[in-house]
Structure formats: C-alpha cells, structure tokens
C-alpha cells in the first residue's frame, strides 16, 4: 500500500479529531479556556486544573487536560496569565498541546461594570504519531520478520508546530457577564505534508454568558444563589450550545446542562446530544468540580464523559485586589 495514500486515508477518517479543538463541560470552572478576558477577572490569583475523559466505554478513548494560572495587577490595570491545554487520542496516539500567554486590560465603565478586552498568543504542536503505523518497507517477506523502522522520508514530518493568537472581550458586574472570543486568528497550517500541502486550523468562535440570582434564606449568613450559564461554540461546520443552571448553597452547587447541536448537518441526528450533570464544592480557597455527560446520541453506549476539576484562589501575586469582581462564579 502506498504510504501517502495510507496516510491520507488515515487522516480522512480522523478529521474530526485533528481539526477540532476539545471542549469542556465545566467551562465555568476553567473560563480562561473559552476566553482570555477572564484573566485577572477574579481580582486575585487563580490556579485551575481539569481532566476530561471521553468515551471510556470504548477502546477509542479521548482525554483532555487544561491548566491555567492568572492574576490581576492594579499597577498595570491588567490581568496576566498562562494556560496549557493537552489533548490525546489513545488509539492513533494523536496528541495536541498548546501553551498560551494571556493578557486582559480592565476598563471600568462605572463603579459596578467592567469591560475586559483581551489577547492571547502562544504555540501549538500537533503530533500525528505515524510511527505507530506498519508500512510496506517494514514488512520483510522473504525473511519473515517485521522491521521496527521505516526508511520512508515522508514519515519524518509527523509533527506540526505553529504560532497562534486569539482575541476576546468580556462585560460583567457582580451578577451578570457576557463575552465572546475568537481562537486561531492566524488560521495556522497544520498539514504534515512537506510538499506544500495546506490544512488550515479553522477559527473557533465562543459566545458565552451567565446570570446570578441571589435567593433569600432565613439566615443572613447563608449564601444561596441560582446561576444560569450558556456557551455557544462553532468551528468550521461543527457547532454546540451548552445551556443550563446551577443552584449553589453554602459552597455546594448542583446543576444540569443540555448540550445541543443547533445546526446539525445530519437530519437524523439528535439536536439534544447529551445531558450534563454537574456539581461543585467549595472548601476554604479550593473549588472541586465533577461532571458527567450522559449521551443521548448514537454514542449512548460509550459510557459518557466525565470531568474532574480543582481550582485554588488566593490573594493577587501582584499585591493588590482591586478589580471589579465577576459574577461568573
């Protein structure tokens, strides 16, 4: 089998994995992933980690991790942060890693409202792991053995690195927030073909918002809030809308989200693709999150998707905490 034909067939059937960014159900716990404008929005310093395990009922597993650290500087009137995302597929050994430096600038519209424009820049690496394939020059028929190495020079370019940028904005007060972000402004070339092939990484649009409603209790010390959150994402012909609510009482929250495919290209596919059950627990400066996505589509037998997240918030590493607080948490 011709190696180039083999590789292009391999990529064709894996297109959705290679050309799409991972998404996270707990976007509200790692907001820097959907929009760098959240950088510094908490007023202090925030560290977050999240792990997503997808389709663990199959041998075809997808796993994603996200890490971020950010803080607010009053002297610079800005938020500064670093984020790292990793995504891997267990069968093909495809791996996608991206590191970004995030910057946001605070504009105080008045005493209650803030406007955060932002920009993010970094580098990404997509590794297609073609060394996992068995090619024709490795099969030594007359000797009856398999050579562990291939001499085909086409396989030497199975990793692609690229520069990437995104820009966004966020408008918020202590109860309401709304923002948008556009990733991959440079539409980097992610083709492994060193003979002039071009495969553009499509722009990733995210539009998101939320609203917090304080609920009354008998005791003033009790904190009882209702949150409504939504996040719309679109990349090329694929889109998704997450919308739902959480009830938070004294540091413990429970909620449910629906994941929709608003403009599905398949008339037989489900518009509501999954029900996502979420919970959070605050303990001192920590926030622990867990979510489980129950699939309603043809992937119902894959045992769903679950995420675990941990966040830690403390005073700003820049020595000040004067930003307008965001009502996103």
Residue ranges of predicted features:
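Sec-dependent N-terminal signal peptides
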Residues: 5-15
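Short alpha-helical segments used as structural interaction elements across diverse proteins
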Residues: 1-2, 13, 49
């Amino acid at each position: 089998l011709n190696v180039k034909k083999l590789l292009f067939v391999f990529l064709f059937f894996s297109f959705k994995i290679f050309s799409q960014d991972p998404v996270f159900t707990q976007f509200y716990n790692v907001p820097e992933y959907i929009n760098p404008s959240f950088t510094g929005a908490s007023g202090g310093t925030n560290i977050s980690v999240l792990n997503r395990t997808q389709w663990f009922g199959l041998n075809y597993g997808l796993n994603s991790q996200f890490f971020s650290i950010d803080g607010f500087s009053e002297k610079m009137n800005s938020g500064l942060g670093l984020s790292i995302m990793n995504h891997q597929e267990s069968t093909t050994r495809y791996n996608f890693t991206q590191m970004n430096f995030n910057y946001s600038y605070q504009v105080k519209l008045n005493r209650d409202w803030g406007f955060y424009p932002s920009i993010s820049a970094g580098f990404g690496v997509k590794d297609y792991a073609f060394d996992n394939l068995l090619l024709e020059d490795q099969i030594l028929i007359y000797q009856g053995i398999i050579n562990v190495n291939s001499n085909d020079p086409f396989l030497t370019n199975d990793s692609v690195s690229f520069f990437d940028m995104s820009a966004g904005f966020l408008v918020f007060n202590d109860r309401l927030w709304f923002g948008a972000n556009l990733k991959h402004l440079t539409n980097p070339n992610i083709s492994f073909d060193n003979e002039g092939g071009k495969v553009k990484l499509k722009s990733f649009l995210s539009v998101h918002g939320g609203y917090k409603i304080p609920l009354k209790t008998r005791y003033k010390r009790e904190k009882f809030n209702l949150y409504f959150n939504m996040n719309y994402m679109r990349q090329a012909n694929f889109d998704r809308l997450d919308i739902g609510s959480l009830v938070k009482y004294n540091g413990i929250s429970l909620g449910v989200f629906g994941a929709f495919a608003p403009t599905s290209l398949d008339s037989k596919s489900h518009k509501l693709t999954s029900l996502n059950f979420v919970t959070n627990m605050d303990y001192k400066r920590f926030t622990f999150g867990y979510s489980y996505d129950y699939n309603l589509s043809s992937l119902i037998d894959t045992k769903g998707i679950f995420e675990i997240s941990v966040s830690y918030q403390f005073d700003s590493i820049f020595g000040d905490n004067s930003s307008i607080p965001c009502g996103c948490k």
